[in-house]
Swiss-Prot record:
Subunit structure: Monomer and homodimer.
Function: S-adenosyl-L-methionine-dependent 2'-O-ribose methyltransferase that catalyzes the formation of 2'-O-methylguanosine at position 18 (Gm18) in a subset of tRNA. Selectively mediates Gm18 methylation of tRNAGln-TTG/CTG and tRNASer-TGA/GCT. Gm18 modification can enhance the stability of modified tRNAs.
Residues in the signal sequence: none
Phosphoserine: modified positions: S1442
Enzyme Commission code(s) on record: 2.1.1.34
Similarity comment text for this entry: Belongs to the class IV-like SAM-binding methyltransferase superfamily. RNA methyltransferase TrmH family.
Domain of life: Eukaryota
UniProt name for this protein: tRNA (guanosine(18)-2'-O)-methyltransferase TARBP1
Taxon lineage: Eukaryota, Metazoa, Chordata, Craniata, Vertebrata
GO MF annotation: an example: RNA binding
UniProt cross-references to CDD domains, sorted A to Z: SpoU-like_TRM3-like (cd18091)
SUPFAM superfamilies: alpha/beta knot (SSF75217), ARM repeat (SSF48371)
């Protein structure tokens, strides 16, 4: 149409100057400039044919260029690309720019003045050099793209080079402003799409300049411009890669660049393959594909120079190995394309091809890499970073399995990849989950593969590489945030690496950093196990000649002894053996060298560090100084005990004397100092501190954790040594505590130390027997009296000083220690039960009395000028002094707790208090309780424990008379507990104390008796605890364990009515019986790994060192069930409790059933119902007939509800047991079959299953004939039911019933014999392999009918483990019988054999009866080396045909049809399927598109196309543009003012609902599978995507095109409608 218009204009006016002048007048609209452009192009064509005016035309062109186009472009360049333009919208501005640029190119050609082109280019280049944000940069790009082809390669060569350099810098992001990412990206896209393709056509100088800018070292991968570089490279791929063709083409291109030979090019491609942006990955794949195709077509050898001096090239080609190379690269590209999807079922079939890549890549003859291994790493990196976690896991497993079947040559890339992307992928905890069907407590499959891989890989590493690799591996474990599970399995894998001298001091420090930094917040058991593995790693991999014993001891201190390295564990023994073997090979320690020991010896080292430790330094002067840190004492004690045990290994049979001698050698310096404590008054204070610290740590560390703790010689000898120093130490401590020597804030830590030592000494003497003449006895008595005296003297009201107040705190702490010691050890009772001075003093204490804070100036007089300033600054602050006061109040309540426990019988229970009490704190309990509430508001959460202990004594006494006060104590205590939920160290002790006072049996009994507010408050707190336990595992365990234990004790001590109070709290047992949350995957994973560690038993030292707290949810139910098993059905209170619980369980079942009619398997509803019926089965033996008579209807009714399989089995089982024990209920059972078929539906199967066990039901009935007759009548009716399942169950019941009838030989049934036997025979002999016969065989083999015996299988193991396992219940619900036996808080019932299954049922597997064929085909398929067919994304880059005159085709088609309504062009050249093309053709015709572009016009003859197009192709212009011609076609349309719009999901795609279509729009649709190829994406002006809400995120290309065509049409209709009057 444009050409027709140009012809008409020229025919009317043959003077081009007049015509062009007319067009150059008026407003510079897009339409005017476009008309000028196509008129100039028409004149240019005539000039080329020689028919134009020779003189007038060049002059006219010069005038148009100088007088109109150049000023127009300058005015457009004067405004910034993103700035406001009052006259033109952005899209119209771009349209004007492109039309003006194309017109300018025609003017330059017509004018015949190359200097004009150069001048315009110089001017535009200046704008570009000013940066992309400068005004006119976008216009400058259009000008350069227009005049570039007119520049002369030789004369304008320097200019071309400068333009090319500037363009490359802009395209690589150099034109951005740093913080302006958007403009820089726009510049890169515009320059790469418009300017660079034009420049590389201008000759060798420009092309070399472009390639030089891309391949320069400064533009290498390290600059981080991968996306921009790939944008440019894919745009210029045709010029940067050799042109396949004849010799002439090759000769012409010899001087041109060949990107295949540049290693930077390939590194950029590899980096692109691993980018997060899908479009960047697509461009990288395109470049790889083009390079491979070019290499195959050229047929010439090619090698890319390696980045390093050795190893294979990044890319090479050999014509001799063309087939193998093509096979490798085709598979490689196929895998990379397939990985773009997220569907695992599409990707998994392609993974075997990855194994083939390794076969191609490694030479079997030389054992070296043929292809650079970095290509394989790109695939794995892509898999690791996939959005699909299943694919990530598949990728990790595939990589870890590499060395199982093949040995790959060493490559540095492999090692770097393991340290980098692989370890990053391994940091994902979900990878370590159990496989389906794998039992709980087994090791993670991925953990095992990781261990096997690491062991194999390190064994194959060259010796010189192993050390650096392992060091990097360990350092990587500290370089990021790691969760507990990955660190555990990485540590386990390292621990299994065979012994090798690989690590030095750096490795030891790296291991220490892992423990200190990475694992500090991990779960305790996982952290402990990981520490064990890291110690084993150190022992296996340490080169002892590079480290000293000092280094080793410092590393050992990083291990927490309370979590991993405990004496007596297998790990301790292993460490001792390692030290024994290597002690003479360690590097000499600085300590040993300083005392003249050159030969390394563990004994010498330990002796030296003890001497150094005990020896006082010159700076240890002054009394008011900090107490030393505990680190050194821990280190010395650890090394002493290790050395003693190592010596014991050397002389295994020498006995106690040898141990005593060795210990004496080590500890003589310490013992000498300790013996002088009481006589040397001038001994430095720090020296005494350190010696006492060492004493404590030696006693604590030497305690064995294993089973042989009773006969430990080391511990005995050590205790004897220290007992000999008791008198000296106790005299010293007594002096320090009572003689006003502790008078500064820093001395409070010393007070704590002294009291701990005194407690240890008391324990030592108690072990050997308490004697009244013992020095400790005298010291305790004197300490008690002196402390009381100090406290009484300081109440005189004098002005407080720091010294006096500190002594007051010290005296109260000492008194608290004495009270605790007396309370815990009855042997220490110094006085009779009559109240002595201690009791009288404690009872009259002013509770919660705040210590008055001394004045600051007075404090400073006590301060040492250098050593204590910071401590005193803290004490002078409110917070610092507050801590001291809180400790004082805490110690007061410790003493009071002792007093209340001792004299609890004197506490009055009535509201009236004694007028003149001799023990006020005891005999005035209300006042004491009020003080306790005040203390709870003052004390921090880690100091409330003694207050809770006091409340435990006070609350039962006052609950009746002062209920409101007791309720207030409940509330305040619960507030403290609920705020503590994240503080592990103090939470559990406080919770235990809280439970003991709120749920004390006396409190529960009184509250239930009066039924006041306290009763309801206790129940409220009970439910809050249960609610908290859903978040914090183990909370409910504490409550249920304590209550069950207290009820058991009360039941055994008191006769009738002993459990009556428990009946009032049966909800607690009910909730315990059905307790158990559905954990998130991450929580379940941690629990699985913890179970795995626990199952390791003694092999993992963490299990020995840390006691099993039994905080799993299972133990709540186990506790409740074991409690129920202890109840006696003949005891009336027990019987009432059981019956009340049974009714509540049935209520719960009905409530769950009503809340959700349908529920999925293993949901919380399913689990709760399952637990209800498990508990009812446990209770059944204790239920009598009268009670069952009231609930039997409810049990039968439960059988009619829609239940999961496991619940059905339990209901059927309990019905069988009831009918067996009480046949009187059989009439009600028969009634269940007459409810009406519509009401029953398939639930009748439950009762038919019960009927199949009629032999068990009638076992104790002498007359069975009537029952059998009734059963046969019922069953035969249901054998004719229309439902297949019902018939199947009825036939099984019939078969089993008929077997019983035949055994009894009842004559009345003879008439039925032919009918029944023929029916059963017909069922048995069903022909064929249909479902009916299979299901008949399966139901007969089903465990419930074939193996299960309702009486013999009645045991806890069947109820809680075997039946849930066989019925397909999730493993979380399986409770093994071992857990029942391990839980010792509640004792075993008398008939323990009732717990265990004695039948064959326990040996059955779920696979014996359930269908397990799902997934077997997948397993077989995974092992196949090749797949016959896979889904492949097709890239249409192969076909290359000669260019056609596209515009003539369009003219011809349009002229023939004479129909064009809109200005929309739809390009579908990339679409392959005729169905999609036919549908698009129809849609385009309906909405009036101007033209549909297809890849081949032959498609219109396809029947599928015709079927869907319904003759639309006859009314719509069709143009053929083959895929290789698309770039030229799109460039042409751009110059005609079209906006190129792509339908593609990219990072910068615009939402279709937000995009406004220009009138001249070209819509480019992508291929069905691959989308729009990378080389076309940069031709797009904009990408539009359709907003999607679903999961698949992919629309059919025809549907996508139709949506955009309609949106374009809708917008145009609206805009035209708005312009109408």
């Amino acid at each position: 149409m444009e050409w027709v218009l140009a012809e008409a204009l020229l025919s009317q006016s043959r003077d081009p100057r007049a015509l062009l002048g007319a067009l150059c007048q008026g407003e510079a609209s897009a339409e005017r400039v476009e008309t000028l452009r196509f008129l100039l192009q028409r004149l240019e064509d005539e000039e080329a044919r020689g028919s134009g005016g020779a003189g007038a035309l060049p002059e006219a062109a010069r005038e148009v260029a100088a007088g109109y186009l150049v000023p127009l472009l300058r005015s457009l360049r004067g405004r910034p690309a993103g700035g406001p333009d009052p006259s033109l919208q952005p899209r119209h501005r771009r349209r004007v720019l492109r039309a003006a640029g194309a017109a300018l190119r025609s003017c330059v050609r017509l004018a015949g003045r190359p200097q004009l082109a150069a001048a315009l280019a110089e001017e535009a280049l200046r704008d570009l050099l000013a940066g992309w944000r400068a005004p006119g940069a976008e216009a400058a790009v259009e000008v350069l793209a227009a005049v570039g082809p007119c520049l002369r390669p030789r004369e304008d060569g320097p200019l071309l080079e400068r333009v090319a350099g500037t363009a490359v810098a802009l395209a690589l992001g150099g034109g951005g402003d740093g913080d302006e990412a958007g403009p820089a990206e726009d510049a890169a896209a515009l320059v790469a799409g418009r300017l660079l393709p034009v420049l590389v056509q201008c000759g060798g100088a420009a092309l070399r300049a472009v390639w030089g800018g891309l391949a320069a070292p400064g533009a290498s991968l390290g600059s981080g411009r991968v996306e921009e570089k790939l944008l440019v490279l894919s745009a210029l791929a045709e010029k940067l890669l050799p042109e396949p063709g004849g010799d002439r083409a090759r000769g012409a291109r010899e001087a041109g660049p060949d990107a295949r030979r540049c290693w930077r090019f390939w590194r950029t491609v590899q980096a692109g393959l691993g980018q997060a942006d899908a479009l960047t990955r697509k461009r990288a794949r395109y470049l790889l594909q083009r390079a491979v195709e070019v290499s195959a077509e050229l047929g010439a050898d090619c090698t890319c120079g390696p980045q390093e001096g050795n190893g294979p090239s990044l890319f090479w080609w050999s014509e001799r190995k063309k087939d193998e190379l093509l096979k490798f690269w085709e598979n490689y590209i196929l895998i990379m394309e397939t990985l773009e999807g997220n569907q695992i079922h599409v990707i998994k079939p392609v993974l075997p091809k990855l194994n083939n890549l390794f076969e191609y890549a490694v030479s079997e003859e030389n054992g070296c890499w043929l292809f650079h291994p970095s290509w394989h790493m790109c695939i794995y990196k892509r898999m690791f970073e996939s959005e699909n976690k299943i694919l990530s896991k598949e990728g990790v497993i595939h990589f870890l399995e590499l060395y199982e079947t093949k040995i790959l040559p060493f490559s540095p890339e492999f090692s770097e990849f393991i340290i980098g992307p692989l370890m990053d992928a391994l940091s994902e905890s979900s990878l370590y989950s159990r496989s389906p069907g794998q039992p709980i407590g087994s090791c993670s499959p991925l953990g095992l593969k990781l261990q096997k891989f690491l062991v194999t890989y390190i064994s194959l590493l060259p010796e010189e590489i192993k050390s650096s690799f392992l060091l990097k591996f360990i350092r990587k474990m500290t370089s990021r945030h790691w969760c507990a599970v990955p660190i555990l399995f990485l540590s386990k894998a390292l621990a299994n690496v065979p012994r090798h001298k690989a690590l030095g001091i750096d490795g030891l420090l790296a291991l220490r950093d892992v423990i200190h930094c990475t694992m500090i917040t991990h779960q305790i058991l996982l952290r402990g196990a990981a520490q064990c593995y890291l110690l084993q790693t150190a022992m296996n991999l340490l080169d002892v000649e590079k480290v000293s014993l000092s280094d080793v001891s410092t590393f050992l201190m990083s291990l927490r002894q309370e979590e991993s390295l405990g004496r007596g564990t297998s790990l301790w023994t292993e460490l001792c053996d390692w030290l024994r073997v290597n002690e003479s090979y360690f590097k000499p320690s600085p300590t040993c060298s300083s005392i003249g020991l050159h030969k390394t010896s563990l004994n010498a080292y330990v002796k030296s560090i003890v001497q150094e430790y005990v020896k006082s330094s010159a700076w240890e002067t002054g009394e008011n100084c900090f107490m030393p840190d505990w680190f050194e004492a821990k280190l010395v004690s650890l090394m002493v005990l290790l050395a003693v045990d190592v010596e014991g290994m050397k002389t295994q049979y020498s006995g106690k004397q040898r141990t005593e001698n060795v210990l004496r050698i080590f500890l003589d310096p310490l013992l000498d100092v300790l013996m002088k404590f009481s006589t040397n008054a001038y001994m430095p204070l720090l020296k005494t501190d350190r010696c006492l610290q060492l004493l404590l740590k030696l006693l604590n560390t030497c305690r064995l954790k294993g089973s042989s703790a009773q006969d430990d010689e080391v511990s005995t000898v050590l205790q004897n040594f220290f007992m000999s120093t008791t008198e000296s130490i106790s005299e010293f401590i007594l002096r320090r505590l009572t003689m006003n020597e502790l008078n500064s804030v820093s001395d409070l830590d010393r007070c704590h130390l002294y009291l701990m030592v005194l407690t240890e000494l008391i324990n030592l003497h108690l072990k050997v027997g308490w004697k009244r003449g013992n020095p400790i006895w005298r010291v305790i008595s004197l300490l008690k009296n002196a402390s009381i005296q100090h406290l009484q003297e300081m109440d005189s009201g004098q002005e407080p000083t720091v010294g006096s107040q500190i002594q007051r705190v010290v005296s109260m702490a000492a008194l608290a220690m004495v009270c605790e010691a007396i309370d815990q050890k009855p042997e220490l009772q110094l006085d009779s039960l009559h109240a002595g001075p201690l009791e009288s003093f404690l009872s009259s204490l002013q509770l919660n009395q705040t210590l008055q804070k001394p004045h600051a100036e007075e404090q400073s007089s006590y301060a040492h000028p250098l050593e204590c300033s910071s401590v005193l600054e803290e004490s002078s602050s409110s917070q610092g002094w507050g801590k001291i006061v809180a400790q004082y109040i805490h110690d007061q309540w410790v003493c009071l707790s002792f007093l209340l426990k001792k004299y609890h019988t004197l506490i009055p229970t009535t509201g009236s208090e004694i007028l003149e009490p001799f023990l006020p704190a005891v005999q005035m309990p209300i006042r004491t309780l009020q003080s306790a509430l005040e203390a709870l508001t003052v004390l921090s959460s880690d100091q409330v424990l003694p207050v809770f202990h006091c409340l435990k004594v006070l609350v039962p006494k006052l609950l009746t008379s002062s209920e409101s006060l007791c309720i207030e104590s409940f509330d305040m205590a619960w507030k403290i507990i609920s705020s503590l939920s994240n503080t592990q160290l103090i939470f559990w002790a406080n919770l235990k104390a809280f439970v003991q006072f709120v749920f004390d049996n006396k409190v529960l009994t009184i509250a239930a008796k009066i039924k006041g507010q306290a009763y309801f408050k206790i129940k409220e707190i009970m439910y809050k605890i249960i609610e908290m336990s859903a978040i914090k595992t183990g909370v409910f365990n504490t409550l249920i364990s304590y209550c069950c234990q207290s009820w058991i004790v009360s039941a055994s001590n008191v006769s009738q009515g002993s459990l009556s109070s428990a009946k009032n709290y049966s909800e607690l047992i009910l909730e315990a019986c059905i307790f158990g949350t559905v954990f998130r995957r991450d929580q379940r994973l941690v629990q699985d790994v913890q179970t795995f560690i626990e199952n390791l038993g003694h092999d993992c030292a963490a299990n020995i060192v840390m006691e099993n707290t039994k905080r799993e949810d299972h133990y709540v139910r186990i506790c409740a069930v074991k409690f129920l098993c202890l109840l006696d059905g003949s005891n009336m209170s027990h019987k009432l409790f059981i019956e009340d619980l049974a009714i509540k369980l049935l209520d719960k079942d009905e409530l769950v059933s009503k809340s959700k009619k349908r529920y999925y398997v293993n949901s919380l509803q399913h689990r709760v119902k399952n637990r209800v019926w498990q508990t009812l089965l446990v209770l059944f033996p204790r239920l009598d007939q009268n009670f069952l008579n009231g609930i039997i209807d409810r049990i039968f009714q439960a059988g009619f509800t829609n239940n999961q399989a496991s619940i059905k089995y339990f209901i059927e089982w309990i019905i069988i047991l009831i009918l067996h024990k009480f046949p009187q209920f059989l009439p009600k059972f028969w009634d269940c079959f007459s409810y009406g078929e519509e009401n029953l539906k398939t639930s009748i199967c439950t009762f038919l299953a019960v009927l199949s066990h009629l032999d068990i039901i009638t076992q104790n009935i002498p007359e069975k004939k009537l029952i059998l007759k009734q059963a046969l009548i019922v069953v035969l009716q249901w054998c004719f039911n229309h439902n297949f399942s019902v018939r199947l169950y009825a036939l099984v019941a019939l078969k089993k019933l008929w077997t019983v009838c035949k055994v009894l030989s009842v004559e009345e049934f003879d008439a039925l014999t032919p009918v029944i036997e023929s029916s059963l025979h017909q069922v048995e002999s069903m022909h064929g392999a249909g479902n009916a016969k299979k299901n008949w065989q399966r139901i007969q083999e089903h465990f419930f009918f074939a193996t299960f015996h309702p009486l013999k299988d009645y045991c806890l193991e069947t109820i809680f483990y075997i039946l849930p396992r066989l019925s397909g219940l999730i493993e979380d619900e399986w409770i093994t019988i071992d857990k029942f036996t391990r839980f010792t808080d509640v004792p075993l019932a008398a008939g323990f054999q009732w717990y265990l299954s004695q039948t064959q049922l326990s040996k059955l597997k779920p696979g014996d009866w359930s269908q397990q064929d799902i997934g077997t085909n997948l397993v077989e398929a995974d092992n196949q080396a090749e797949w016959t067919d896979v889904q492949k994304k097709i890239i249409p880059w192969n076909s290359r045909v000669s260019d056609l005159d596209l515009e003539l085709l369009f003219q011809d088609r349009a002229a023939r049809l004479g129909k064009s309504i809109s200005r929309l062009i739809v390009v579908a050249s990339l679409i392959d399927k005729p169905t999609n093309l036919g549908g698009l053709c129809r849609t385009c015709e309906v909405f009036g598109a101007s033209v549909l572009v297809v890849g081949s016009l032959q498609c219109i003859s396809d029947k599928q196309f015709q079927h869907l197009s319904v003759s639309a192709e006859q009314w719509l212009p069709l143009v053929e543009v083959k895929p290789p011609q698309l770039i030229d076609y799109l460039q042409q349309k751009k110059t005609e003012g079209y906006t190129i719009i792509g339908v593609e999901q990219t990072a910068k795609s615009l939402d279709l609902t937000q995009y406004c279509f220009p009138e001249k729009s070209l819509l480019l649709l992508g291929n069905e599978r691959e989308g729009i190829p990378a080389n076309l994406i940069q031709q797009l002006d904009v990408c539009v995507e359709i907003p999607q809400q679903g999961i698949i995120r992919s629309l059919n290309v025809h549907v996508s095109g139709a949506l955009l065509i309609w949106e374009y049409t809708r917008q145009q209709l609206l805009s035209h409608g708005d312009t109408k009057p």
